[in-house]
Amino acid sequence: MGSKMSDPLVIGRVIGEVVDYFTPSVKMSVTYNSSKHVYNGHELFPSSVTSKPRVEVHGGDLRSFFTLIMIDPDVPGPSDPYLREHLHWIVTDIPGTTDCSFGREIVGYEMPRPNIGIHRFVFLLFKQKKRQTLLSAPLSRDRFNTRKFSEENELGSPVAAAFFNCQRETAARRR
């Protein structure tokens, strides 16, 4: 393990702006279109993240349950993110050692649509104390607060996280 300062989640300000420092205890992989892997801080184009990704939990067991949250902390733009955080997806009751398709989608996937600047899109995985821990879906996608949601639903600190950068594409950049 490297120092906290070399952690891409610290460098990318996910730790600090979105969640407090935590030690990952579960491995999570995020893949779009079966070939575009999410690596912390790497860029993906909006055209490659239109459909929901496969998110695999490599930890726990079938008796462990996890909640996945995807947010954009940079709305409407990174220089003035007054709508922070924008909620893109929540899936609960994901059994350990499986993927999010085995969970319960509380908030449907919304594809990234960054308008101004480079946005971070963050996946956070929390271990639930038991199945069906979460009460209900948030009323709004804007001004979502991961820390508050985690506290209200007794999720504690994340057990895994990943993020990618994304910015608006010009027609010439679309692939």
Curated annotation (Swiss-Prot):
Keywords: Cytoplasm. GO terms for biological process: negative regulation of flower development; vegetative to reproductive phase transition of meristem. Expressed in vegetative axillary meristems but not in the main shoot meristem. It comes from the Eukaryota. InterPro entries: PEBP (IPR008914), PEBP-like_sf (IPR036610), PEBP_euk (IPR035810), Phosphatidylethanolamine-bd_CS (IPR001858). It is found in: Cytoplasm. Induction: Down-regulated at the onset of flowering. Gene3D superfamilies: PEBP-like. GO terms for cellular component: cytoplasm; nucleus. Pfam families: PBP. Belongs to the phosphatidylethanolamine-binding protein family. May form complexes with phosphorylated ligands by interfering with kinases and their effectors. PANTHER family: PHOSPHATIDYLETHANOLAMINE-BINDING PROTEIN, PROTEIN CENTRORADIALIS-LIKE. This is CEN-like protein 4. It comes from Nicotiana tabacum.
